[in-house]
Amino acid sequence: MHQEPHVLNFGKAGNGPTITAGMALAIEPMITRGSAKTKVLADEWTVVSVDQSRGAHFEHSYAICPDGRPFVLTSPDGGKAELARFGVEISDLLA
């Protein structure tokens, strides 16, 4: 379903792949109330915590536009309202 590059939700800045214009990224953080250790079930899709604690998962899809700025494909306003709080300007795809 997803293509390269595989970008982890954790790590040190500057050590992963370079994100460039033309990429589409699925950002999929997961959190659990207990152990951070997880396993994938036999269906090769379902992820559970090893201690069976409750968890949550959500996804947003981003396009990196030709101007190098992001556009959130899963947000009606392209992510403008939420990303502005962090000083991030989105691409002008809605203009």
What are these regions (language model features)?
Residues M1-H6:
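Short, basic/aromatic beta-hairpin or loop at an interaction surface
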Residues G11-A95:
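Charged, cofactor-coupling segments
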